[in-house]
Curated annotation (Swiss-Prot):
NCBIfam families: PRK00024.1, radc. Disulfide bonds: none annotated. It comes from Rubrobacter xylanophilus (strain DSM 9941 / JCM 11954 / NBRC 16129 / PRD-1). The keyword Glycosyltransferase does not apply. This is UPF0758 protein Rxyl_1530. The lineage of its organism: Bacteria, Bacillati, Actinomycetota, Rubrobacteria, Rubrobacterales. Gene3D superfamilies: 5' to 3' exonuclease, C-terminal subdomain, Cytidine Deaminase, domain 2.
Length: 227
C-alpha cells in the first residue's frame, strides 16, 4: 500500500511546524511535538501518526522515560535514528528540570525518596534499580539507574552499586527500585540483595541508609527492621 499523504500535503494551518510558529509550542499536542522532532514519517504514516503510535504503545508520554532504543524500535516505522532523537529529547528534558531547580534535594525520610523517584520509575513495566548518592548533609548528589530487570544478586552486584558512589565521593546511599505490579512488599531476592549491598557498604565505609520499594505507595526496609 502506498503512502496516503505527507504532512506537507496538509493545509498550512494543520501542519505542526506552522502551528508552532503561529501559536507557540504549547499549542501542539504531545504527538505533534514529537512529530516535529521526528521530521519525517514512514511510507505508511506521517511523523505525527508515528509519534502517536509511540506514545500509545508506551501507555502514555510519562512511560517513555526509561525506554530503550530496542523497545522504541518495536513500533513499526521507528528506526534507530528516530529512537535516538526521542531519547536525546527526553534526556534534555530531564537535564533542564535539574537545571531549573539547582538546589539539591535532601533525603530525610523514605517519603523523600518516594518523592524523588516516583515520577521516574513508579509506572515502568520493568524493575529499575536506582542508587541515590548522598553527601554528608544527606543532599542528593545524583541517582543513577544501576540495572533494569528482575532484581537478583546476579544483576545487582555491590561493585556496580558502589562504583558511582565512590566516584562521586558519596557519604551514604539509599537503594530504591520499583515493583511494576504495584505491590510494594519486598521479595526474598529484594532482601538478599539489600543484605549483600549493606554488608559491602559497611566494609568500604559507605552506609546504606535504606532500601525503598516504589509502587502503589512505598515500602521502607529500614522502617520495617529489615536493614
Amino acid at each position: 500500500m502506498g503512502r496516503r499523504y505527507t504532512i506537507k500535503q496538509l493545509p498550512p494551518e494543520l501542519r505542526p511546524r506552522e502551528r508552532l510558529l503561529a501559536g507557540g509550542a504549547s499549542a501542539l499536542s504531545d504527538a505533534e511535538l514529537l512529530g516535529v522532532l521526528f521530521g519525517i514519517g514512514s511510507r505508511e504514516k506521517t511523523a505525527v501518526e508515528l509519534a502517536g503510535d509511540v506514545i500509545s504503545g508506551a501507555g502514555g508520554l510519562h512511560n517513555l522515560f526509561g525506554a530503550s532504543v530496542h523497545e522504541l524500535k518495536q513500533v513499526k516505522g521507528i528506526g534507530e535514528a528516530k529512537a535516538c532523537i526521542l531519547l536525546a529529547a527526553l534526556e534534555l528534558a530531564r537535564r533542564l528540570s535539574v537545571a531549573r531547580n539547582p538546589g539539591r534535594p535532601v533525603i530525610s525520610s523514605p517519603a523523600d525518596v518516594d518523592g524523588l523517584l516516583r515520577g521516574r520509575i513508579a509506572n515502568l513495566d520493568r524493575e529499575h534499580f536506582v542508587v541515590v548518592l548522598l553527601n554528608t548533609k544527606n543532599e542528593v548528589i545524583e541517582a543513577p539507574t544501576i540495572s533494569v530487570g528482575t532484581l537478583s544478586s546476579s544483576l545487582v552486584h555491590p561493585r556496580e552499586v558502589f562504583k558511582p558512589a565512590i566516584r562521586a565521593s558519596a557519604a551514604s546511599v539509599v537503594l530504591a527500585h520499583n515493583h511494576p505490579s504495584g505491590r510494594v512488599e519486598p521479595s526474598r531476592e529484594d532482601r538478599e540483595v539489600t543484605g549483600r549491598v549493606a554488608e559491602a557498604g559497611g566494609i568500604i565505609g559507605i552506609e546504606v541508609l535504606d532500601h525503598v520499594i516504589v509502587g502503589e505507595g512505598y515500602f521502607s526496609m529500614k522502617e520495617h527492621g529489615m536493614l
